A protein has these predicted regions:
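Active-site glycine-rich loops that stabilize anionic/oxyanionic intermediates
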Residues: 8-11, 70
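Short beta-strand/loop motif that positions the catalytic acidic residue
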Residues: 148, 154-157
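Conserved alpha/beta-hydrolase "acid-adjacent" motif
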Residues: 161-168
């Protein structure tokens, strides 16, 4: 089995470091691709990012456990829609049910005033980040999510309880038949950064536990 953690927009593969370390310490190996690195030979937009991400996943011969945060979750939904036979299970973290076009527009305006070095730190240019966000505005997740049949865990940070991301998580839980829902305490949108220990524990328990009796009970060994 291949385990892949997919970062969100504004992150890179290092955003998973603490989660990855905790899982490694407990005998689970994970892959953490950098989305901007795998799309570097193409114009940066969502279609090209998905194509290169799908090629990356298809390079593995084994079935896959996919974990995606935000943008990563959108890619996971598209991948399982096209290649359901490749998937063992998926975890969606802070993943939108409907693309918030107004929020994306505001975010792009903010991006235009941010220093270039902030984007360079995650391996992309300001221009590429703006282009990517623009290309995602018309994606249609509601057409795809109800057709997901694999075991699915949907996660949202506790601090998002009053915003659109919590509503999205509950809606995904409603329309995906074999899904369960988990709130991670002391975390906002970037759950992998805000509370990596509890997230790693939750991922471990979901992957290693019995699906029908899934609940967060197993405790991971915490590295120093």
């Amino acid at each position: 089995m291949i385990n892949i953690l997919v970062h969100g927009l504004g992150q890179d593969e290092k955003s998973w470091n603490e989660v990855k370390n905790q899982l490694n310490n407990n005998g689970i190996n994970v892959e953490t691709p950098n989305l901007f690195s795998i799309v570097k030979n193409y114009q940066v937009n969502y279609d090209n990012m998905y194509k290169t991400f799908a090629d990356y996943c298809n390079s593995f011969n084994e079935k896959i456990n996919l974990v995606g945060l935000s943008l990563g979750g959108v890619l996971v939904i598209d991948y399982i829609t096209e290649f359901p036979e490749k998937i063992n299970s998926i975890i969606l973290i802070g993943t939108p049910y409907k693309i918030p076009k107004t929020i994306f527009t505001i975010q792009n305006i903010i991006y235009k005033f941010m220093p270039k070095r902030i984007f360079e730190n995650i391996g992309c240019s300001k221009k590429d980040a703006i282009s990517l966000l623009d290309s995602m505005k018309n994606l249609s997740i509601p057409d795809k999510a109800p057709h997901i049949k694999s075991n699915t865990l949907i996660i949202c940070g506790e601090k998002e309880k009053d915003n659109i991301n919590m509503k999205s998580a509950k809606q995904l839980n409603k329309v995906i038949q074999n899904s369960k829902f988990k709130i991670i305490e002391n975390a906002g949108h970037e759950v992998n950064i805000d509370n990596p220990i509890e997230l790693a524990n939750t991922i471990y328990d979901f992957w290693e536990g019995q699906w029908k009796n899934y609940k967060v009970t197993t405790k991971l060994q915490v590295s120093n």
